[in-house]
């Protein structure tokens, strides 16, 4: 039994080492002069699911790095006037946001001594901020293609990223003048796919948008009504009357 236990333990250690090796190899492949991104994504994809590595910040840091490299290679092709995939550029940025944010969450967990050593935040936040406008571009492209579920992901990520702890020092919720407009776009995309919860989630951030605010409030009121939340519906109509007195919709529905 002791020999069998030792063999099982040895296999577990070997498997764990293999997954850690996958993470390092995936990063190395993505960093090649001629990277094989398919192979890199396959390796890191396995590590992102494996119990031994899925809760390690480094795994998600490498996952985000691979997406950043995909974006860089596509942009290099564009600069050299070679064929490039615009949607691949945008989707790599969307995934980069997801992976770097997950990396940051894991890196903020205190170690066994109760200390937080987040070595990833500064560099990853810088990469995310540099590409944040492309979340808008990606959302607009999908919205114009009538692929509203995909558009919603981009607009929603843009809005939600304003509240990411790793970007807190930029105070995006206060300083980003485009935020209300993109929140309105998120509300429109959510309406197109019939996602009432998403409308209710993003519409409040859109109310200060000069052109779309009144429509966001209207869509939010409709969403509450559709969900059968009469109290919230009436409250949103009353708020609409106060915020947008020139819009007859709110008063007409309240009476």
Which residues does each predicted region cover?
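Bacterial Sec-dependent N-terminal signal peptides
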Residues: 1-28, 240
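Start-of-domain marker
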Residues: 19-80, 84-88
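Structural register within alpha-helical repeat arrays
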Residues: 25, 39, 63, 70, ...
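Canonical positions in the second alpha-helix
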Residues: 47, 103, 158, 205-206, ...
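Short coil turns that delineate tetratricopeptide repeat
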Residues: 52-54, 108, 163, 210-212, ...
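Alpha-solenoid helical repeat scaffolds
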Residues: 57-62, 115, 137, 168-173, ...
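Short coil/linker segments at helix-helix boundaries
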Residues: 66-183, 197
